[in-house]
């Protein structure tokens, strides 16, 4: 399943993509009329939280089938052309990112590879697919992109052994880790350079892990104005998904809706000769196999 959150006619909701259509089932409406018992999550995050005791996907499947069989199925759909995409799930706790997890990316920026180079991104930096990111020209002329695979956590845990780590994954998404290279290079920490308003585009979907069985063998392609900048594969990650979860959960308790960014391959603007940073009006597309394409724009003004 591909889950998303959106705004439609001034109201926020969430849904699941309709197969072979550029549309979604509005799950707020579907559950309101066809939920089994009292199961009626108000947001996608609520659904992930309840998934620890109830099979969320199975409840979605049953409710959608009931909506289809009602003869009024179209009343429960929204067209993508009519909605504003929001971040698929707003974490209640953490947006955790691993840096220098691709050797070629570390090399292009002359960074030493460390086993753990971890930082957080402010939740206020989250934005959705097709949104416009402020150009931040008042503080930097070195705005950069980093296309990444994102892990979405599905159940709570800490000190998770590697052998059980994938049990804690609900699904995967796309992240563009927008970075102010000027601040990053001037400071000994990454939080400020990585937490700009609009600096964490996520989406357009969360793809459930059953639909992405080989997340460590998918291509990541980032384009700026249709020019290919990054063309990598998650197989190049130094620490794999189970290792990332094992390492971070030694120190941090993970909860449903937490997002973990797994690092970026080579091809960022700062690594080019000469560097090519994002400019007002630029379009950035990050595509990952079997998830989709995350598109964002840099504001003209």
From Swiss-Prot:
Disulfide bonds: none annotated. A divalent metal cation binds at residues 146, 148, 177. Keywords: Metal-binding. Coiled coil: none annotated. It comes from the Bacteria. It holds the Pfam family FAA_hydrolase. Gene3D superfamilies: Fumarylacetoacetase-like, C-terminal domain. One of its GO terms (molecular function) is acetylpyruvate hydrolase activity. Belongs to the FAH family. This is Uncharacterized protein SSP1806. It comes from Staphylococcus saprophyticus subsp. saprophyticus (strain ATCC 15305 / DSM 20229 / NCIMB 8711 / NCTC 7292 / S-41). The lineage of its organism: Bacteria, Bacillati, Bacillota, Bacilli, Bacillales.
């Amino acid at each position: 399943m591909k889950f998303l959150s959106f705004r439609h006619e001034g109201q926020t909701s969430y849904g699941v993509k309709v197969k072979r259509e550029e549309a979604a089932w509005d799950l707020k409406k579907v559950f309101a009329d066809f939920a089994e018992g009292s199961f009626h999550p108000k947001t996608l995050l609520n659904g992930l939280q309840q998934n620890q005791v109830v099979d969320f996907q199975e409840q979605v499947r049953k409710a959608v089938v009931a909506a289809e069989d009602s003869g009024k199925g179209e009343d429960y759909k929204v067209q993508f052309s009519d909605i504003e995409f929001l971040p698929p799930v707003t974490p209640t706790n953490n947006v955790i990112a691993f840096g220098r997890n691709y050797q070629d990316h570390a090399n292009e920026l002359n960074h030493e590879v460390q086993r753990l180079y971890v930082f957080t991104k402010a939740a206020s930096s989250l934005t959705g697919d097709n949104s416009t990111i402020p150009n931040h020209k008042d503080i930097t002329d070195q705005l950069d992109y980093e296309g990444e695979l994102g892990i979405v956590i599905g159940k709570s845990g800490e000190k998770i052994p590697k052998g059980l780590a994938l049990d804690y994954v609900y699904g995967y998404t796309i992240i563009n880790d927008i970075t102010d290279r000027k601040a990053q290079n001037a400071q000994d920490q990454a939080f400020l350079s990585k937490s700009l308003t609009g600096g964490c585009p996520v989406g357009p979907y969360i793809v459930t892990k059953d639909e992405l069985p080989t997340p460590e063998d998918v291509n990541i392609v980032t384009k700026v104005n249709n020019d290919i900048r990054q063309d990598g594969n998650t197989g190049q990650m130094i620490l794999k998904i189970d290792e990332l979860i094992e390492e971070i959960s030694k120190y941090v308790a993970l909860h449903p809706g937490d997002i973990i960014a797994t690092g970026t391959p080579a091809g960022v603007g700062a690594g080019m000769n000469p560097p090519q940073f994002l400019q007002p009006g630029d379009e950035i597309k990050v595509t990952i196999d079997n998830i989709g394409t995350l598109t964002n724009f840099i504001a003209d003004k």
